[in-house]
């Protein structure tokens, strides 16, 4: 469902945010934007295609300016651990597996708004947290996440690939 995000009165730019899936008539535009802005993320999109996911597209003057895609999954099994539970309830997370903003649209708050949309949707879906992984060198992405309050855990994978695992807690464990 489209929602207006901002209007620039000087240039009459119309920006809207929509949720798309593979049946959306403009799905190919997302794939084209993915190929142009973040081709290294395509394997993660294709790998997760068999799981329920949500794609949020931000349109600037009716063109895909940025997107964020996440899956809702139990916390644990993705890293070969048993599902985490709290008080007998299995915890779920919104795991971001694709996020990019066209180079020409960067620096306008689009990436921040997309991240905020995921946080809002994840809360509405009953997720315990939002999780995301990013390679080192993605400083704009890191800046957005850290500015929004995500926690960060740097890590190195077996092939000496350095990255950061980001977590945004959504629910408190307070007993009060």
Model-assigned labels for residue ranges:
Residues 2-43:
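Short amphipathic alpha-helix that is part of the acyltransferase structural core
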Residues 4-12, 154-176:
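C-terminal "cap" of GNAT-fold acetyltransferases
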Residues 53-57:
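Hydrophobic beta-strand residues of extracellular immunoglobulin-like
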Residues 61-64, 69-98:
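Conserved acyl-donor/pantetheine-binding loop and adjacent beta-alpha core of acyl/acetyltransferases
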Residues 97, 102, 106, 133-135:
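Residue-level recognition of the GNAT/N-acetyltransferase active site
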Residues 101, 107-120, 147:
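Conserved acetyl-CoA-binding loop-helix of GNAT-fold acetyltransferases
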Residues 112, 124, 136-154:
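Conserved active-site alpha-helix within GNAT-family acetyltransferase domains
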Residues 122-134:
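Conserved GNAT acetyl-CoA-binding A-motif
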